[in-house]
């Protein structure tokens, strides 16, 4: 086989369906839209969720829940992400943002116990999960709630 003999695998390529190009094409005249009716018109069809006038599902089901206006969204940091820092470093939310561990400070930083920590650090954050605080202490590090 030579480079000029390369061909796509059999059945992997399809020719484009050209509609409205004569009756010999199989999709001429009405271009696959049938005769008259709402769907045959330009811009025709029903909106998403329309069920022919029957009360649609999204209106049959009751509303649920609410949006808590005082909800706090914390930036999440996993323990294994803290391994990039040198031993003895004081890890602050500002340092985490500078180094690209988190993209935005949001309403604070929460440290979770995903992965293992191998470096002794002083970690300052707004919240710690119980397991994360335990793992930091095991390595000899300290936690400080801001």
From Swiss-Prot:
It holds the Pfam family Ribosomal_L27A. Residues 21-31, 42-52 have a biased composition (Gly residues). One of its GO terms (biological process) is translation. Gene3D superfamilies: 3.100.10.10. Residues 1-58 are annotated as: Disordered. GO terms for cellular component: cytosolic large ribosomal subunit. Keywords: Ribonucleoprotein, Ribosomal protein, RNA-binding, rRNA-binding. PROSITE patterns: RIBOSOMAL_L15. Residues 1-13 have a biased composition (Basic and acidic residues). GO terms for molecular function: rRNA binding; structural constituent of ribosome. Part of the 50S ribosomal subunit. Belongs to the universal ribosomal protein uL15 family. Binds to the 23S rRNA. HAMAP family: Ribosomal_uL15. This is Large ribosomal subunit protein uL15. The lineage of its organism: Bacteria, Bacillati, Bacillota, Bacilli, Bacillales. The gene is rplO.
